[in-house]
A protein has these predicted regions:
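A general structural signal for stabilizing positions within well-ordered secondary structure
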Residues: 80-81, 185, 253, 306
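Low-complexity, acidic Ser/Thr/Pro-rich repeat tracts that form intrinsically disordered stalk/linker regions
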Residues: 35-54
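Active-site groove signature of glycoside hydrolases
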Residues: 178-210, 268
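Secretory targeting and sorting signals
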Residues: 1-39
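Glycan-recognition patch characteristic of GH18 chitinases/ENGases
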Residues: 52-184, 348
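Loop/turn elements at helix/coil->beta-strand transitions in domains of secreted/extracellular proteins
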Residues: 55-60, 85-91, 145-152, 187-194, ...
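A cross-domain feature marking catalytic cores of carbohydrate-active enzymes
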Residues: 63-65, 94, 153-157, 195-200, ...
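Substrate-binding surface in catalytic domains of secreted glycosidases
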Residues: 105-123, 201-349
Length: 349
């Protein structure tokens, strides 16, 4: 059975994906990405190769709060790797969505963890009595070094998208809670806006949503009304361009009216969550002979969103900086069978 999979795995720490504003444009260096909600399973990715962006272009990378644990990837690594010079935006993932409200995802990683001097962006250790520690304080320091860099707090993801259905029942209350959290005086200077990663409106991901086609538009409209025109409001969305698929399930054109852009999740179309196959490239740019599922490509997703009325200027193409694989495959060409997931650095497949 085919269903666009939003894995718990994508390595979201910085440059895990990059996006571009047009399908035919250069894929690296023109825009930024998207994600999932539990610890990732792919290896740390290299930063985008391009060092400059076109005028108005965006290079958006994800930094995941859980990366500071087993991956040992910290905000400092964004600076020491040189990635901070190549990015225009960072999506900080994830905040939780529960009880119809935005909520902290991991208080220890977010704002409690004390950093030593050698772990800190600026080489200055945290003190026991300072108001803010953790990733938030490190992001604040990173922004001081890179004043044009924007940080957006992303809520939801694969694991925490089940809370959006309740939020959709009272969009104004949801937006109020998100604003109060993002603009908390302790870290209001860290974030430049909010991103919602709902997987998926009126469709199934880890859980199934039945909020209806208009629910996403209701949430984005409420968020824009509350955050105003000076904050960024974005959303990570499905790339399922199949007939009757996830793009068809919601009013993405209507929701786009309130958003600065969409991070279209044009990756993980195929993978070893289907352990026996069909085997296929996980992130095809275009369709090809023998593709196991029509509509599972970047080209199909962008075309369907444009046909629905989403402006091309509001779509960023997602690129996963990792590979996926199977073991025991029966053929080189796509569409073969397998015996299971290939070994991986953090997770099989």
């Amino acid at each position: 059975m085919f269903g666009l999979h939003r894995p718990r795995a994508r390595f979201r720490a910085l440059a895990a994906a990059a996006c571009t504003t047009a399908l035919g444009a250069t894929l690296l260096g023109v825009a930024g990405t998207a994600s999932a909600g539990t610890p990732p399973t792919t290896t740390r990715a290299a930063a985008p190769a391009a060092t400059t962006t076109a005028a108005g272009g965006k290079v958006v990378g994800y930094f995941t709060n859980w990366g500071v644990y087993g991956r040992n990837y910290h905000v400092r690594n964004i600076e020491t790797s040189g990635s901070a010079d190549k990015l225009t935006h960072i999506n900080y993932a994830f905040g939780n969505v529960t009880g119809g409200k935005c909520a902290i995802g991991d208080s220890y990683a977010d704002y409690e963890k004390a950093y030593t001097a050698d772990q800190s962006v600026d080489g200055v250790a945290d003190t026991w009595d300072q108001d803010l520690r953790g990733n938030f304080n490190q992001l604040r320091k990173l922004k001081k070094l890179h004043p044009d860099l924007k940080v957006i707090w992303s809520f939801g993801g694969w694991t925490w998208s089940g809370g959006f259905g309740e939020a959709a029942k009272n969009p104004a209350a949801f937006a109020e809670s998100c604003y109060n959290l993002v603009e908390d005086p302790r870290w209001a200077d860290v974030f430049d806006g909010i991103d919602i990663d709902w997987e998926y409106p009126n469709a199934c991901g880890l859980t199934c949503d039945t909020s209806g086609p208009a629910a996403l538009k209701g949430l984005t409209s409420a968020l824009r009304s509350k955050f105003g025109g000076n904050s960024l409001v974005t959303a990570a969305i499905t790339a399922d361009g199949s007939d009757g698929g996830k793009i068809d399930a919601a009013d993405y054109a209507g929701a786009a009216q309130s958003l600065d852009w969409y991070n279209v999740m044009t990756y993980d179309f195929f993978g070893a969550w289907d352990a026996k196959g069909p085997t296929a490239p996980h992130s095809p740019l275009t369709s090809y002979a023998g593709i196991p599922k029509e509509g599972f490509s970047s080209e199909a997703a962008i075309a369907k969103l444009k046909a629905q009325g989403v402006p091309a200027s509001k779509m960023l193409l997602g690129i996963g900086f990792y590979g996926r694989g199977w073991t025991g495959v029966t053929q080189d060409a796509p569409g073969g069978t397998a015996t299971g997931a290939a070994p991986g650095t953090y997770e099989a497949g």
